[in-house]
Each structure stands twice: as C-alpha cells, then as structure tokens.
C-alpha cells in the first residue's frame, strides 16, 4: 500500500499473509478457507504455500496453516484479468482468537460511488520499494463504474474500483487482500497501474461471486 499507515494490532483480524516462503499476497479467512485472488495462486503449488494469521508484523510468527488445496476460479482470464478470485483450503480449521477472526461477506450489492472503504496489506510502499514489516491500512473511495471503465478498458460489473488521489493505493504484494466497507469484505485486490500513479485500483467484486465461494467451500 502506498500512502498508508501502520495498522494497529488486532484491528484487522481477518487479514492473512500468504507466503512461499516469502510474503507474496494477502487474503482473508473463514473457518477452513482463505479468500484471495486467482492470480496469486496460478503457478503455485499447495506444497509451497503457507497462511500466516494473527499478526500485523511479518517477522512475528503467530498462527501458521498449510495449504491443502488451491482453488482457482475456472473462468479466470489472465489477459483480461476477470474472475480473479481463488480459495485456499487449509489443512485444519483456523482457530479463532481475539487476533484471528473471519471476515463478513456482503448480503447485498449496496456499495456506491463515493463510499469510503478500507484496504489493508503488506504490499510495497512505493513502486519497486520494500515490503513493510507492519501491515498497512488506508481509506479509499469507491469510483463510479463508468469513470473506471475509461481508465481500465474491459472492466466488468463483477469488478469494482477505488481511487482517492495520486500517491495512494495498492501495490505489489497487496493482491488477494480484502477491501472492506463497514466490516464487510466487498472486494479482493486484483490489479492497478503500479503503483498509486493516479489511476483507479481494480478489485474483484465479492458480491458477484458469493455462489462460487459457497460452492467451493465444501
């Protein structure tokens, strides 16, 4: 995240770090699954991916879970970057504590342009910059779909965009992480023009994939 601030411990108990063995993407948790982006999982094997929960610091080990299965949406298109959603089934139930909690998923698609949303992640703090040790947080705004379509040709209704200003937004390593409105995850970090150069960030719209998520969380 470019332009963010250090997230306090326990404020985002649903956020996890995916590692192989270094941090490569973010995700959010339910009892047995991690929700993330498809592009995070493509080319990875379940044997190399671990899920790290319960800490805002990358160098402080809390709860570590092994991946049992990597599930990529079969309609994921790596050229158009649509249907960019995936799940990791972990090898045992995630144990909930004050610092490890599931994220709520949306029951309706009520989010609209101008709404404030919170993005969290351990992505780079500027283009080609370092990965921060402390989880970063930033408040962004939802952008009108039409405006976003001008900037990102091929945008679909199953995607959602954010923008605030130049110098704020997602960066490499934030992918797969949660975009949250009022405690409900509405987006998954998908792509943007790296990084924070004045163009909207694009997220997978969680509401559009509720059926897929349910079907694949056996």
From Swiss-Prot:
GO BP: proteolysis
Annotated protein name in UniProt: Chymotrypsin-2
Superkingdom: Eukaryota
EC number: 3.4.21.1
InterPro entries: Peptidase_S1, Peptidase_S1_PA, Peptidase_S1_PA_chymotrypsin, Peptidase_S1A, Trypsin_dom, TRYPSIN_HIS, TRYPSIN_SER
GO CC terms of this entry: extracellular region
Organism name: Vespa crabro (European hornet)
An example Gene Ontology molecular-function term: serine-type endopeptidase activity
Catalytic center residues: 39 (charge relay system), 84 (charge relay system), 175 (charge relay system)
Top EC class of this enzyme: hydrolase
Cysteines engaged in disulfide bonds, as pairs: 25-40, 148-161, 171-195
Other facts: An additional Arg at the carboxyl end was found in some of the molecules.
Domain Peptidase S1: 1-218
Family, similarity comment: Belongs to the peptidase S1 family.
Signal peptide: none
Alphabetic keyword roster: Disulfide bond, Hydrolase, Protease, Secreted, Serine protease
Subcellular localization(s) per the UniProt record: Secreted, Extracellular space
Reaction(s) catalysed by this chain's protein: Preferential cleavage: Tyr-|-Xaa, Trp-|-Xaa, Phe-|-Xaa, Leu-|-Xaa
């Amino acid at each position: 995240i470019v332009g963010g601030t250090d997230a306090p411990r326990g404020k985002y108990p649903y956020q996890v770090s995916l590692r192989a063995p270094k941090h490569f993407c973010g995700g959010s948790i339910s009892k047995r699954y991690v929700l993330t982006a498809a592009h995070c999982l493509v080319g990875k094997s379940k044997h190399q991916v671990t899920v790290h929960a319960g800490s805002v610091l990358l160098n402080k080990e809390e709860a570590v879970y092994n991946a049992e299965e990597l599930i990529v949406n079969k309609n994921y298109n790596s050229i158009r970057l649509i249907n960019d959603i995936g799940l990791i089934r972990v090898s045992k139930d995630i144990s909930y504590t004050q610092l490890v909690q599931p994220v709520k998923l949306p029951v309706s698609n009520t989010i609209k342009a101008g709404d404030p949303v919170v993005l969290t992640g351990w992505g780079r703090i500027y283009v080609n910059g370092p990965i921060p040790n402390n989880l970063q947080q930033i408040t962004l705004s939802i952008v009108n779909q039409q405006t976003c379509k001008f900037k990102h040709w091929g945008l679909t209704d199953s995607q959602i965009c954010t923008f605030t200003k130049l110098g704020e937004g997602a960066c490499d390593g934030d992918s797969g992480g949660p975009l949250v409105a009022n405690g409900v995850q509405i987006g998954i970090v998908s792509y943007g023009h790296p990084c924070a150069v004045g163009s909207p960030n694009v997220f997978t719209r969680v509401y559009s994939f509720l059926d897929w998520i349910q079907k694949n969380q056996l």
